[in-house]
Design a protein with these regions (language model features):
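Nucleotide-sugar donor-binding/catalytic module of glycosyltransferases
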Residues: 1-246
């Protein structure tokens, strides 16, 4: 597929009409030249006015598309996969529809990605005003990160930039049969194939929030499911050719 942009933001949407405004405002505020990126909203058959709100609030100068699914999938995996397949960006970045990002995320992220030919760019993030897992973000900027030394296994959330070519060539997609922590499986698989990984932790770039309303990706899990997620992740890394010391 033709590459037209440096990066594509992929936003899965389901019944977010009352919560999506901060997300769109943060997209509108991005400092990266608008000709260099696009936004792909994938609506998972919302029953409210989410699509109308997006069309009303999004800056008309932004390259954006809305993919409308006719049948709801019930999780974020299928919409994200559609976004990956439709992307025209050299990189993809995943953003949940009720979260928001710093205005410099795209600009700083793509700069370090292009500089280092990064396969993955990690961003420092906050969850409900609490910094998530500080260890990988000990240093403000890391051009070439190491999985073990930089504790990258401690944060497998998918709120990162991923090189689209790496995902497509290795058929890295979200497992649609997994309803919780699907991002951990995706993140672990991407780590298996990533040769260059960079970290941006000079500021908080991604702001995640939790709400009681229905959400595509933030669901509770049983301890049994959590165990299977970690087991699969560790097994995948052990079976790979990566020299990783699990301590």
């Amino acid at each position: 597929m033709e590459i037209k942009y440096d990066v594509s933001i992929i936003v899965p949407v389901y019944n977010r009409e009352n919560l999506i405004k901060p997300c769109i405002d943060s997209i509108n505020a991005q400092t990266l030249d608008k000709s260099r990126w696009e936004v792909i909203f994938v609506d998972d058959a919302s029953t409210d006015g989410s699509v109308e709100v997006i069309e009303k609030l999004i800056n008309e100068n932004i390259n954006y598309r809305i993919i409308k699914r006719e049948i709801p999938s019930g999780n974020a995996s299928a919409p994200r996969n559609e976004g990956i397949k439709a992307s025209l960006g050299k990189y993809v970045f995943f953003l949940d529809s009720d979260d928001y990002i710093d205005s410099k995320l795209l600009e700083n992220g793509i700069n370090i990605a292009l500089k280092n030919d990064s396969d993955i760019v990690y961003f420092k993030m906050e969850l409900n005003a609490r910094t998530v897992t500080k260890r990988p973000f000990k240093h403000p900027i890391v051009d070439k990160a190491d999985i073990e030394k930089n504790h990258l296994m401690r944060t497998l959330r998918i709120f990162k930039m991923f090189k689209t070519k790496m995902l497509r060539e290795n058929n890295i997609l979200f497992d649609v049969t997994v309803n919780v922590c699907e991002d951990m499986l995706f993140g672990a698989t991407a780590l298996l194939y990533a040769k260059n990984i960079s970290i941006l932790a000079d500021r908080d770039y991604y702001f995640a929030s939790l709400h009681d309303e229905p959400h595509l990706s933030k669901k509770k899990m049983t301890l049994e499911k959590l165990f299977h997620i970690y087991f699969y992740t560790i097994q995948s890394l052990y079976c790979s050719n990566r020299d990783i010391n699990f301590k």
